Amino acid sequence: MIGLLYRAADRLRRRRYPENHGRIGEDLAHRYLRSQGCTVVARNYRTLAGTGEIDLVVWDGGRLAFVEVKTRSSTDFGPPESAVDAEKRDRLRTAARDYVRRADVDWKAVRFDIVSVILQASPKIEWLRGAF
């Protein structure tokens, strides 16, 4: 019975729905950044006002990086990071200001990164430090 539940859960996890892509990409990015020596301090951080969300907040050396994770199954419509347009960058900056204010961090120590994930048989992960 338990084996059947595990197989069913695995099938659900592997479905190719966009909401699953995002979650899988965030999980891969989280593990990747940790493997690169980052300390993850927040996942899916939401502002108190509910006006924004940041996928990952990490310390990379002495820099606090606000990380947007973008995931696609292919590059047919461009690389994942191309989805981070000016409007999205503005929302991320607003959410980052909220985090910095609450965490009492110097804004000069802040950086904005993008982790691009392409889900293939062997996922491709690219970390764009200081992307904007």
Curated annotation (Swiss-Prot):
Any single Pfam family the record assigns to this protein: UPF0102
Gene Ontology terms for molecular function: nucleic acid binding
Family under the similarity heading: Belongs to the UPF0102 family.
Protein name: UPF0102 protein Acid_2433
Naturally occurring in which organism (per UniProt): Solibacter usitatus (strain Ellin6076)
